């Protein structure tokens, strides 16, 4: 009777729903592993699961007064994590057919994300051979019974959902020692819990996700700031978004690709969300690519309109672009301010109260945004992402990293770069964190000062940018920073060392590609390994395809929710080319993406990048990584610029060419460095050319197309 009354009370107050595979609790041996978000979790499971399980509860909690009061109504067993016999007792209970609930995190979350996973529950599952049923609780964290007051917008009676995921098993790992087997089993359970989180993420559009974040963290919570030093709340950002959307619809149509040539600023964020909510697809243009790069993007994406700012063009010395690129309609934000009418203002006011009614009908799998590749190996390609792929990558990041609304992001990487967009804008907004948008990562003195002044805790950048920030920063500038993540290029040892020595901060290296929105793998404090880029993100499948001549590793191919919808190419304007990749049998598999990168995956799942397939040279039948040649030069001259290319050779098929700005680099010095680093002498170039500067793309990456032409033609210069 008491159970029925309490169940009715909870269902009435919290509108509790239970969904998923609810008929799988009949397994002979069963372990239930929920996430732990509040003190209500145990009561919810006891009341709403269709079975009466035993709860494994730590001894520190079983001795409290309320647990003694609950003992007559709920079966629980005291679990002492320091006593090995406690685990054996749980194994016996499971083997006897008692379903057991174990909270793998061992404590209520204080971040809103998954915390450390204890390996005890996993070892019990592996030892007993029990079915593991992960459960995802959503909603209790918003109550006053959670530990996220001041982090989330708490309320008395939020809606609570209990998601039951499909049962799985944890086979006993193969390892010589019991301790190692426990650790490996724990990592398997961690993977299961992360997959459960990803499986229950709602399918939304970008604008819907922004509204959900506003509801979750509070409409008046500050969320975004730029160089105007005016901090906007979710409500203010929504107001600007509605305003831009109202104006954009005057000269664009639903489904149109709309070019945006804008800096890192709040108005750019509003323009992206504003275009999206009215069914327009923003194409974020690289303002460093020059007129030729812009024209390629315009052709590939079939752009008719480019939205920009006169002030931005003047400050960036880009006023020549509208004159040189005259095949599109240029629209200036400054000119639009005076066109806002009373009707527009009333429309904005109404939809501030009912924002979802401003949206045109859209699906999560519809095209949401177009980014462009750097063009380092040919013409830039338009990369079309859906709402679902962008938001999936955000959730993948949030699943493995413990970002919270207390964090402050410094975002200086351009928003036209996938790294800057997803990690520097969408992730903080969807997490409730504050983000400071700065227009240039090249201001090496200003960025560290702003990190210090705005109390930033999260900083992302390339190895080059982070190395220069360290050179100019005061040792105290990064005192509050707890996450520094490097991506987009290989992390230099010198950069890693100066951050450790000067600031006491370990840089976490990650790996991504524009086609994957972009993060593919990343080291985090909970799972990091030196000389790797971390583990592949949850929800992604990875496979390695053998490449003839390369003994270690293979060509990385990926499939997952964050993969792009497809390419837009200059050669086939406006036509979406869906992703596919050749499998080991040479057959095309749809929805797989071939990164073109040679990587290794170790037994723990950590990924190490060896180089790009296109950046290998074949010398007398042996494959040599051009990046390994560059690393030799960097070891001799860390301050210089170095790039390797290949040229045709009648004797060996191909020969190496090293371009460097350091005239003191010689073949003899390179041979000595190769011997010291265990690099074969075959990887030491005979052709060393000193240049004043390397040819660079607008993104700052070397222009390998031009370098390849220079390698073939000794007379050609930058």
From Swiss-Prot:
Family matches, as NCBIfam families: PRK08043.1
Reaction catalyzed: a 2-acyl-sn-glycero-3-phosphoethanolamine + a fatty acyl-[ACP] = a 1,2-diacyl-sn-glycero-3-phosphoethanolamine + holo-[ACP]; a long-chain fatty acid + holo-[ACP] + ATP = a long-chain fatty acyl-[ACP] + AMP + diphosphate
GO CC aspect terms: plasma membrane
Family to which the UniProt record says this protein belongs: In the N-terminal section; belongs to the 2-acyl-GPE acetyltransferase family. In the C-terminal section; belongs to the ATP-dependent AMP-binding enzyme family.
Region annotated AMP-binding, chain positions: 233-646
Record-level GO BP terms: fatty acid metabolic process; phospholipid biosynthetic process
Membrane topology: Multi-pass membrane protein
Full protein name: Bifunctional protein Aas
InterPro entries, sorted: Aas (IPR023775), AMP-bd_C (IPR025110), AMP-bd_C_sf (IPR045851), AMP-binding_CS (IPR020845), AMP-dep_synth/lig_dom (IPR000873), ANL_N_sf (IPR042099), Plipid/glycerol_acylTrfase (IPR002123)
Gene3D superfamilies per the UniProt record, alphabetical: 3.30.300.30, N-terminal domain of ligase-like
């Amino acid at each position: 009777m008491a159970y029925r009354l309490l169940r009715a009370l909870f269902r009435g107050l919290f509108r509790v729903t239970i969904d998923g595979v609810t008929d799988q609790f009949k397994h002979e041996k069963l372990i239930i592993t929920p996430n732990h978000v509040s003190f209500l979790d145990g009561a919810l499971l006891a009341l709403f699961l269709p079975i009466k399980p035993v709860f494994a509860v730590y001894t520190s909690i079983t001795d409290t007064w309320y647990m003694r009061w609950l003992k007559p109504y709920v079966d629980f067993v005291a679990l002492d994590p320091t006593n090995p016999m406690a685990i054996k007792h749980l194994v016996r209970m499971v083997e006897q057919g008692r379903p057991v609930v174990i909270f793998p995190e061992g404590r209520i979350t204080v971040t809103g994300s998954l915390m450390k996973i204890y390996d005890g529950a996993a070892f019990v599952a592996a030892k007993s051979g029990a079915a593991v049923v992960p459960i995802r609780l959503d909603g209790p964290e918003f109550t006053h019974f959670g530990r996220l007051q001041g982090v989330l917008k708490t309320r008395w009676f939020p809606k609570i959902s209990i998601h039951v995921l499909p049962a799985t098993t944890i086979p006993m790992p193969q390892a010589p020692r019991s301790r190692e087997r426990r650790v490996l089993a724990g990592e398997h359970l961690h993977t299961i819990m992360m997959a459960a989180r990803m499986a229950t993420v709602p399918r939304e559009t970008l604008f819907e996700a922004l509204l959900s974040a506003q509801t979750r963290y509070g409409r008046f919570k500050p969320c975004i700031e730029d160089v105007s030093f005016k901090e906007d709340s979710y409500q203010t950002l929504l107001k600007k978004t509605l305003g831009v959307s109202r104006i954009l619809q005057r000269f664009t149509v639903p489904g149109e690709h709309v070019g945006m040539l804008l800096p890192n600023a709040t108005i750019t964020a509003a323009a992206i969300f504003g275009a999206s909510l009215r069914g327009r697809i923003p194409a974020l243009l690289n303002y460093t690519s020059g007129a030729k790069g812009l024209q390629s993007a315009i052709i590939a994406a079939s752009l008719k309109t480019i939205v920009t700012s006169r002030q931005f063009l003047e400050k960036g010395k880009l006023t020549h672009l509208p004159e040189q690129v005259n095949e599109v309609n240029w629209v200036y934000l400054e000119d639009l301010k005076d066109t806002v009418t009373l009707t527009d203002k009333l429309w904005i006011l109404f939809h501030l109260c009912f924002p979802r009614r401003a949206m045109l009908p859209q699906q999560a799998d519809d095209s949401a945004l177009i980014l462009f590749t750097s063009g380092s190996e040919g013409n830039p390609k338009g990369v079309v992402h859906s709402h679902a792929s962008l938001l999936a990558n955000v959730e993948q990041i949030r699943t493995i990293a413990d970002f919270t609304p207390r964090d402050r992001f410094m975002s200086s990487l351009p928003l036209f770069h996938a790294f800057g967009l997803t990690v520097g804008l969408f992730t903080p907004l969807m997490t409730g964190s504050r983000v400071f948008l700065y227009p240039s990562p090249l201001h090496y003195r200003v960025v560290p000062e702003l990190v210090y002044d705005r109390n930033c805790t999260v900083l992302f950048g390339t190895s080059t940018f982070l190395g220069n920030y360290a050179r100019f920063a005061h040792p105290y500038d990064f005192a509050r920073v707890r996450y520094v993540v490097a991506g987009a290029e290989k992390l230099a040892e010198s950069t890693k060392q100066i951050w450790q020595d000067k600031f006491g901060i370990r840089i976490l290296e990650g790996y991504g590609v524009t086609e994957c929105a972009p993060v593919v793998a990343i080291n985090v404090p909970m799972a990091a390994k030196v000389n790797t880029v971390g583990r592949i993100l949850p929800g992604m499948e990875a496979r390695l395809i053998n490449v003839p001549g390369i003994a270690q590793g293979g060509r990385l191919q990926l499939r997952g929710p964050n993969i792009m919808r497809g390419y837009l190419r200059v050669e086939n304007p406006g036509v979406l080319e869906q992703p596919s990749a050749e499998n080991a049998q040479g057959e095309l598999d749809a929805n797989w993406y071939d990164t073109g990168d040679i990587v290794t995956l170790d037994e723990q799942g950590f990924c190490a990048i060896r180089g790009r397939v296109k950046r290998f040279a074949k010398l007398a039948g042996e494959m040599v990584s051009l990046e390994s040649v560059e690393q030799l030069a960097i070891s001799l001259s860390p301050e210089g610029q170095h790039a390797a290319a290949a040229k045709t050779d009648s004797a060996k098929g191909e020969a190496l060419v090293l371009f460097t700005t350091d005239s003191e680099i010689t073949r003899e010095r390179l041979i000595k460095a190769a011997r010291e680093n265990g690099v074969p002498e075959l990887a030491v170039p005979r052709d060393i050319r000193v240049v004043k500067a390397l040819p660079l793309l607008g993104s700052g990456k070397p222009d390998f197309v031009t370098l390849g032409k220079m390698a073939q033609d000794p007379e050609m210069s930058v």
